[in-house]
């Protein structure tokens, strides 16, 4: 008899109970998940799941076990008490059971799009079952949770729990910004950060701001030659409203007449030789505009000036590692 379970309920759509977050909280008491948000990119067949917990140890154990279980998980990045899962859309077999060699005690069995919602399918055993049946389902951002059986609603001990958690569908929007300042005044990262803080559009969730070190050897630059990127999770139908807000905020607050703003939508990071060139070469506006067009990146600024060079660099590096903030070759 095997000691792990591979998609035990695969294809079984039976639902015994559906609970909203407040009902989960009432049943189990308040627990520890502080955020649960899912973005999807149907063109690439990918999803990104952001989860924040009050306790770092829970995040770290979940990450190791979800990776071991496989399923829809492709990779997971950890930042303190939060994780970001890169996942594939669909339902997949998992190596799930009591934690052991190549077996995870918690598993992401699938991610599916249902209209303007996203369903994530989970399995957990023992304490990890409490995570998928009681903790995640009451997180801010969750709409409701389906439990296939009454047994799934009594997690803990040595028992297995499975759930399907529904959240609003979001898309990822990355915005690169450069050349808002001059040698006399201004700071692009400050203006970009203020823009993010001021955005209160319903259906838009601010994720993070990144600083991108550009080539400090270019002759026509501000002192440190640094661009900024803003990342947002955005509900379908809200993207243009967000972009209009960002453009108006940035251009009204800029002290430079050369401000550039570039936009990329989706979860697949563009691969381009300009990832290196933006840190090592002196580039022209024309070649950066041509590369942006090739990659499906669009400019929304009105200046159409040299800021577009750094804005392209910022959006290309917006979702990469700490190397974004360094000179070429620094790690």
Language-model features, listed with the residues they occupy:
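Conserved mixed alpha/beta catalytic, RNA-binding, or beta-rich assembly cores of soluble enzyme
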Residues: 2-331
